[in-house]
Regions:
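A gly/proline- and charged-residue-enriched helix-loop-helix capping module
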Residues: 210-259
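Short, high-confidence coil segments that cap the C-terminus of an alpha-helix
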Residues: 109, 176-178, 241-243, 355, ...
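Conserved acetyl-CoA binding element of GNAT-fold acetyltransferases
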Residues: 203-220, 377-388, 417
Length: 452
């Protein structure tokens, strides 16, 4: 029964003791009532054909119990409606704030007891159903006509980055079936979900083509709003797509302008399980640890070898860097970088201030490089690579120290990226040791799985 009830509604079974003297049920505060009780009232002597309720509460949650007799309660969250016949004094129904309800079909002699989370406040009711529906959350699937609105929201959100703007997301749109969602309340956009649909697997990914792609939210969003958005998103996925699985990559906290981990709680409440965990090395630029001596020695060696650091161009320098990178990946893993040269050039043309290449040059030869993604608060090394000459002469050490100490010294975090493979099952110990040598320590990039 509970699975078919609207958002947050729940049947509560109270303890029952029965002997030859009769039956006794009881409720002991928080053990049985999921809020602090601030008000208790009871309804009785309801004339035949009359109803009670017919409203929703802006803040108050209630537990409704038939102490005697029976009645039917209709609960409605604007998307789902259910009727429940209440006829056992040992059972109640939880009505969360924001759920419409009305009581009807009272049996003669019925007594209805109500526990409430807040004192009475006449201004805390919505009594008009049309007004109530206007207050409810609505969801729209993204299309190209909404690109400007999407990008504008990313920029004012508390956890969005340029990777979540459509100019970045859609560079490889042909590889994915987009099913990104936009959530509105009272006509205002309050949250967005970058997502793609894998029909053959019945799976929604948020997002399969991005390092992270969790819920993008406005600064005003609070925990209960995000719970509502998650419920709405899951309902939409099941109803519109027939999905039964959702893979979710939260946006790591370092990218948020203010705390924004309400989605992690919503994942827990939705029964999500941790599927993958990558470990990334990050420098807190306001509380830096010293570089290891081995990294300092590399910098000295690089300087003595005549290597110089400069911002690279996105033509010849990028091609030379990509060839070094591709050679390393092909040798170790038998694959090329995720992005081609032309894709990186396209993305740079769309985000010239966010995507930059820095190189270590020996005369005019590229011996090491770092492709940087700059979100304003966080600098992320999307790709790092060094030639054999560069490795022998500390080229990356000098390049990275220059970026950390000089070019991006005013940023909050410097993120080297993950050092794990196979969903986190394998840790490249040499790679993470190198990153930690610059004073970096770990955060995680997670993927959660929800089945429904």
């Amino acid at each position: 029964m509970e699975k078919q009830l609207p958002r947050g509604c729940k049947i509560i079974e109270f303890p029952l003791a029965v002997d030859d003297r009769g039956a006794l049920s009881f409720a002991e505060g928080a053990r049985h009532i999921p809020f602090q009780i601030e008000r208790v009232f009871w309804i009785y002597d309801v004339p035949e054909g009359k109803t009670r309720g017919g409203h929703s509460h802006c803040e108050t949650a209630e537990v409704v119990i038939p102490l005697n007799g029976s009645f039917t309660i209709t609960v409605d969250d604007g998307r789902h409606s259910a009727e429940v016949r209440m006829e056992s004094s040992g059972k109640g129904i939880l009505i969360p704030q924001g759920v419409w309800c009305h009581l009807h079909d009272f049996a003669p002699g019925t007594i209805c007891l109500v526990f409430a989370s807040h004192p009475y406040d006449a201004s805390g009711y919505i009594n008009d159903y049309s007004e109530y529906l206007n207050e409810q959350l609505s969801v729209v699937r993204y299309d190209l006509s909404r690109q400007t609105e999407w990008d504008s929201f990313v920029r004012i959100s508390k956890n969005g980055t340029f990777l979540l703007e459509r100019g970045y997301m859609d560079y490889h749109a042909a590889r994915f079936t987009d099913c990104s969602l936009m959530f509105y309340k009272k006509g205002n956009l309050i949250a967005m979900l970058p997502a793609n649909w894998k029909e053959e697997e019945g799976t929604v990914q948020s997002h399969g083509g991005l390092t992270y792609g969790g819920l993008i939210v406005s600064p005003s969003m609070v925990a209960i709003n995000v719970l509502e958005v998650f419920s709405c998103a899951i309902d939409w996925m099941k109803r519109e797509l027939g999905a039964h699985r959702w893979l979710y990559k939260p946006i790591p906290y370092i990218y948020s302008s203010i705390p924004a981990e309400e989605d992690l709680y919503a994942l827990f409440r939705s029964g999500a399980v941790l599927k993958e965990r990558g470990i990334s090395s990050v420098i807190d630029c306001s509380n830096r640890l010293p570089m290891r001596q081995s990294r300092k020695s590399g910098c000295v060696k690089a300087a003595k070898s005549g290597l110089r650091i400069e911002q690279g161009n996105m033509t010849s320098h990028l091609e030379a860097f990509w060839n070094i990178l591709a050679g390393i990946l092909n040798e170790k893993h038998g694959k090329n970088p995720v992005h081609t040269v032309s894709e990186l050039q396209l993305l740079h043309s769309r985000f010239p201030e966010n995507i930059k290449l820095f190189v270590a040059l020996k005369e005019e030869s590229v011996e090491a490089g770092a492709l940087i993604y700059d979100t304003g608060k966080v600098v992320h090394t999307q790709y790092l690579a060094s030639s054999e000459y560069g490795k022998r002469n500390g080229a990356l050490d000098l390049l990275l120290r220059n970026l950390i100490d000089d070019v991006y010294s005013d940023r909050t975090y410097f993120d080297f990226g993950v050092s794990t493979e196979d969903g986190g099952a394998f840790l490249n110990e040499g790679l993470i040791f190198q990153k930690e040598g610059f004073g970096a320590r770990s955060i995680v990039y997670d993927t959660y799985e929800m089945l429904f």
